[in-house]
């Protein structure tokens, strides 16, 4: 298990305090308006953070987007708890979640050698590995030894790099500020409405 990766939307945002004061003042006449606007903006920011994290990691590593995205979890904000964060944790991923060739099953003594790449660089041979049903498998020893799945890095390891953290943190902050303006405008225009068009009370 790798150390968890976790980023809060407002940590490090110098512009947030002033924006929040403006939003609070603008929505002071609408009960629940301020908390609703902030909640929606926070949750949109954390969603964009996950998207940015996946893109930033895939700029450097060949890991598939699906397994990568599933390793991130968003703690959603509510009107009573105006906090949200983006986290990632998990064990090492199978090497088959990274780029490899060939894609078809390989069997027999004359099978094609398996090659894989973790970084966005050239493919390299993976010992005596073979491909079966889309998975890379390998034996450590004779045919009587159990099959193992060669592993690549875990997502927290991929995410806990300064360049990824900086991109995600700044992007989340920018999205929050932009969405806060939008949400305040929407509430001033239409009042408090749920996503299904119903009124929100509180």
Can you annotate each of these PLM segments?
Residues 1-202:
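Short, Lys/Arg-rich flexible segments
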């Amino acid at each position: 298990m790798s150390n968890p990766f976790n980023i809060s939307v407002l940590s490090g945002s110098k512009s947030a305090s002033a924006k929040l004061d403006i939003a609070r003042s603008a929505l002071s006449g609408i009960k629940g308006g301020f908390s609703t606007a902030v909640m929606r903006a926070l949750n949109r920011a954390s969603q964009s953070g996950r998207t940015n994290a996946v893109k930033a990691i895939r700029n450097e590593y060949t890991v598939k987007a699906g397994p990568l995205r599933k390793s991130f979890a968003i703690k959603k904000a509510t009107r009573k708890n105006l906090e949200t964060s983006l986290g990632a944790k998990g064990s090492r991923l199978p090497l088959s979640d990274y780029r490899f060739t060939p894609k078809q099953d390989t069997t027999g003594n004359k099978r094609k050698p398996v090659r894989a790449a973790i970084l966005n660089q050239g493919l390299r041979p993976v010992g005596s590995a073979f491909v079966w049903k889309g998975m890379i498998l390998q034996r450590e020893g004779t045919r009587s030894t159990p099959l193992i799945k060669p592993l690549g890095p875990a997502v927290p390891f991929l995410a806990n790099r300064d360049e990824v953290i900086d991109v995600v943190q700044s992007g989340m902050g920018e999205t929050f500020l932009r969405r806060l303006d939008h949400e305040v405008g929407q509430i001033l225009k239409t009042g408090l409405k749920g996503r299904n068009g119903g009124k929100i009370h509180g």
